[in-house]
Every structure is written in C-alpha cells, then in structure tokens.
A protein has these predicted regions:
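Bacterial N-terminal signal peptides
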Residues: 6-18
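Alpha/beta-hydrolase fold catalytic core
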Residues: 17-66, 88-90, 109, 117, ...
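Conserved HGGG/HGGXW glycine-rich cap/lid loop of the alpha/beta-hydrolase fold
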Residues: 52-102
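Alpha/beta-hydrolase-fold catalytic nucleophile elbow
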Residues: 96, 161-162, 270
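Active-site loop/oxyanion-hole signature of alpha/beta-hydrolase fold enzymes
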Residues: 97-135, 151, 177
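Conserved hydrolase catalytic core segment
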Residues: 130-173
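Alpha/beta-hydrolase
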Residues: 174-300
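Catalytic active-site module of serine/aspartate enzymes centered on a nucleophile-bearing elbow/loop
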Residues: 306-343
C-alpha cells in the first residue's frame, strides 16, 4: 500500500471508499443519479461468525465464486462499477471487513491475518460455494494472498489490483530515502487517529468544517439514498482499525506471503500508470524511483505463478476499479477463461 504524505492523506480521507468522492456534496437537479450505488444502500447477507455479523454483498449466479476484498479504507461500494458486470457471468460477493460498511466491529482492532480469518469464517458460515477467485485491491491484496496461503484448496485464481507488497519495508531497502520523504506509517496515520478522536465524541457531520477531512465528498451523481447513509460508516472503530491494519503491514510479519509459489494458478496483477500524486519536489524525485520499485514488486508477484500476468493500466491511478473498471473486469474474465480451459 503506497504511503501518503500527511497532507495528502488528510485531504483525501478515507482513501478508497473516499475515492468514490470526487465532486460536490449536493448534486444539482440536472444530474442523473448513478443507480448502481443503490445496490449498496442496504446490507447484503449478514453472516454470523461467533456472535458478530459480517456483510457479504453477493450478486449473480454460477461458479467459481468471485470474492472482492477492498483496500484499507473501503468496503463493498468501491466495486460498484465492477461487481454488476461480473455478476452477469458468475456469482460475485463483496466482503466488508469487521467495522467497515455493514459489518459489526470485532472485539479488538485487527491485523491483516484477522481479516483473512474473518473472510474464511464468513464464506463458510454463509455457505458461499467454492472454488473462489479472489480479487484484492491495495491492502486487500495481502489479505487475499494470506487466504490463499492458508486455504489453498479453496482458491482457484486471483486478481491483484495495485496490491500492496506484503513487505513494504523492502521499498526503503531498494529506494533509500522513501521513508524520510513520506514519513512512514506513524506520521501518515496521524490524520486517521485525529478522525477517530472526533468520531468517538459523536457522529461525524459532513457539513462541519471540523469533520470535513474525515468524511469525503461523494461524486455528484451519487444517489440521495446513498448520500444519506454514507456518514454513518465513519466511526471511531473504523478509523482506529485502519491504523491497526496499516501498522501491522509495517511490522514486516507478512513478508513470506510474497514468496509462496502459486503453481499454475491463474493470476493477473494490475498496476496503475501513476500510483500517487506528489506535493513537493522531494517527493517527486523519490517517486520516480519508488514507482519503479513498486512495479518491479508487482512483476515479481506475477511470477509466483506459471500462469501469472502483469499489466500496467494506462490512465489509471491507485483505484483502478474506479478509474478503469473495464481493466478489472477483463482481468477477472481472463482468470475465468483460464479456469474453463480443458486440462
């Protein structure tokens, strides 16, 4: 997961679901609402996993089942441009982490392996049929790779969408100066902790200047029904759990995930043309080398399978599923075609 400057993070919280947010808080009357977001106004299948509920938002029918796991700040609606199209071909379920979207919080703040455990428990309790094609964006890419490492017989293929390499400390090793330029996890989580503190005092109000950096602005065509419920998801647990997830990534405890060979599993790794925008000349200088390292890491991930493919998506930023959704749809289609080939 690329590390943002505190200023950039504060300006774009939360990254991901917040990146649905690009325009005005109140659409003009002439704007036609994007009805695809209405599918996410209510929970899908709320699955009990030991006294708390995990939301699985499923569409379509068929096998294998495609499982969508969002990045660190997102939940099901981040896939609104992708999921309905995939559902025309097979069953596809978007997963909300504990405390994200309509899922209940966990009894403690989670680390990445906890999320993989929750996903496994939810798919089992929800009777979601195997095999699975796992699609993970950003931090979700590590979570789906952890899943494949722990339950390999359930996973038929994977699509990794600008995934975080599990050992982001390797970036500093390969590109000295990266941590100094971007501040590392500690400084980049400060805005999240500030938002957690505000949310702990009461519901956040998107019209409040004090809260505006914590709740992103939705796109102008977001339906009013979605706009109405959106602020309720930004709880103190949500912000604090994001810090916990990011900090667990920085601990290097998941480095081995990027080293497990996947045999002949169909695998597509997607990289953006531009990962982040940079606000200072120092960041820009580091970014040129940093992005080369990031792309090289993605290329190495693709080589973990004899049927791995790596693609750079022109015209896309970090959120390829929003910027270039067809690229994600095509990648899933490619994995499905590979699985349907005679053996």
């Amino acid at each position: 997961m690329p590390v943002l400057t505190p200023a950039a993070l504060a300006a774009a919280l939360p990254l991901s679901i917040g990146d649905l947010a690009l325009a005005q808080p109140n659409p003009p009357p002439t704007v036609v609402e994007d009805e695809r977001l209405l599918a996410y106004v209510q929970p899908g299948q709320l699955v009990d996993i030991g006294g708390r509920r995990i939301n699985l938002h499923c569409m379509g029918a068929g096998s294998p089942t495609v499982i969508l796991v969002a990045g660190s700040g997102s939940w099901s609606p981040i896939w609104y441009k992708v999921q309905p199209v995939i559902a025309q071909k097979t069953r596809v379920c978007a997963f909300d982490r504990a405390g994200f979207g309509f899922s209940d919080p966990a009894p403690h703040f989670q680390i990445l392996s906890d999320v993989a455990d929750d996903l496994h428990a939810a798919l089992s309790a929800g009777s979601i049929p195997e095999p699975y094609v796992l699609v993970g964006h950003s931090l979700g890419g590590i979570e789906v790779r952890l899943y494949a490492q722990r339950w390999p017989k359930q996973v038929a293929g994977m699509v990794l969408v600008d995934t975080s390499p599990a050992g982001e400390g390797l970036i500093e090793q390969n590109q000295p100066g990266f941590d100094a330029a971007y501040g590392g996890v500690a400084s980049n989580t400060t805005p999240l902790l500030d938002c957690a503190f505000l949310a702990a005092k009461g519901p956040l109000d998107p019209s409040s200047p004090e809260h505006k950096d914590c709740i992103p602005t939705l796109p102008s065509d977001a339906p009013n029904a979605f706009r109405k419920i959106f602020p309720q998801f930004f709880t103190a647990y949500y912000f604090a759990d994001r810090v916990s997830l990011m900090s667990s990534l920085d601990s290097h405890r998941y480095d081995s995930v990027d080293q497990r060979h996947l045999g002949a599993m169909p695998l597509v790794v997607l990289s953006p043309e531009t990962t982040w925008e940079f606000s200072t000349p120092a960041e820009a200088r580091v970014s040129r080398s940093y992005e080369k390292v990031w792309i090289a890491m993605h290329e190495a991930l693709a080589h973990l399978s004899s049927r791995g493919v790596h693609r750079i998506i022109k015209g896309s930023g970090h959120h390829i599923q929003l910027d270039k959704p067809q690229a994600v749809i095509d990648a899933v289609d490619e994995v499905l075609r590979e699985l349907n080939k005679p053996t």
